[in-house]
């Protein structure tokens, strides 16, 4: 698990990245399923600030502050309704009151579930949400396991899964097994984050933990990034990397 704070036009956005254990290849003790559930739970506790068992390098305990902007990214190896993970594993994030489900879809995912058949025919998750193209005979079939999940209050302008249909010229980039790139599909979102504090709100209480700010500025809460502004961000997460595009005035800058 990585919490990477990124400053976007004066507002801190916490990129929360992880790759929980696949809930498969298990013995009778189901160790991998349990690890997957708990590794997902860590972020659920962290964004709800109920993670008293966690502490940072300065010894401060807990997770993010209530007004923190964040986006959870990665391959979480858990589908809401299908696959091998424990029931409710990914719902710890998808149903959290702190999190927005961007619900990205693709035409290719729905089409492939129909064409490939097998386990896909008995799945309960809408195949338009699928992000992974896995073995269908006998299982697990295609699954939704890759996510871009921002904090509540974030404006989701666009979201999707890059999974072209077979008649699309870009299908060569995803293809069929053995895949030319990955069995995971790129999940992307264009997000506009809320500002952390409005200019009329008081400064954070000195009783709350603070982090040093440049000379002449009020201190900020260590995990909040309490600045005004409405930063826009486009995010894509796929196998092996993350692309973050931020809009600053009339220019675009990219960070990878």
Language-model segments: residues:
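Beta-strand-turn-beta hairpins that frame and shape the catalytic cleft
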Residues: 1-24
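Metal-dependent phosphoester-hydrolase catalytic domains
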Residues: 3-7, 34-40, 45-71, 76-197
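Short, glycine/serine-rich, charged loops/turns that create anion-binding
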Residues: 20-22, 77, 228
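Acidic/histidine-rich helix-loop elements
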Residues: 25-35
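C-terminal low-complexity, Ser/Thr- and acidic/Pro-rich disordered "stalk" regions positioned immediately N-terminal
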Residues: 195-224
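A cross-kingdom C-terminal cell-surface attachment/processing module
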Residues: 228-251
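Juxtamembrane extracytosolic/periplasmic "stalk" immediately C-terminal to the first targeting helix
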Residues: 254-256
């Amino acid at each position: 698990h990585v919490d990477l704070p990124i400053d976007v036009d004066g507002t801190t956005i916490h990129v929360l990245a992880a790759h929980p254990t696949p809930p498969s290849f298990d013995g009778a003790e189901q160790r991998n399923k349990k690890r997957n559930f708990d590794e997902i739970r860590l972020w659920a506790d962290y964004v709800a600030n109920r993670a008293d068992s966690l502490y940072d390098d300065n010894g401060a305990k807990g997770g993010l502050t209530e007004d923190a902007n964040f986006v959870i990214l990665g391959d979480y190896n858990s589908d809401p309704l299908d696959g091998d993970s424990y029931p409710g594993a990914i719902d710890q994030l998808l149903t959290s009151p702190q999190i927005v489900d961007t619900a990205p879809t693709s035409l290719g995912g729905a089409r492939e579930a129909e064409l490939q058949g097998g386990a896909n025919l008995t799945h309960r998750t809408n195949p338009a949400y699928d992000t992974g193209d896995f073995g269908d005979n006998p299982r697990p079939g295609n699954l939704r396991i890759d996510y871009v999940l921002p904090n509540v209050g974030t404006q989701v302008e666009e979201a999707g899964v890059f999974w072209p249909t077979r008649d699309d010229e870009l299908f060569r980039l995803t293809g069929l097994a053995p895949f030319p790139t990955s069995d995971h599909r790129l999940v992307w979102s264009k997000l506009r984050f809320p500002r952390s504090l409005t200019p009329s709100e008081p400064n954070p209480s000195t009783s709350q933990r603070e982090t040093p700010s440049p000379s002449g500025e009020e201190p900020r809460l260590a995990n909040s990034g309490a600045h005004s502004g409405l930063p826009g961000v486009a995010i894509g997460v796929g196998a092996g990397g993350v692309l973050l595009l931020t809009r600053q005035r009339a220019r675009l800058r990219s960070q990878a």
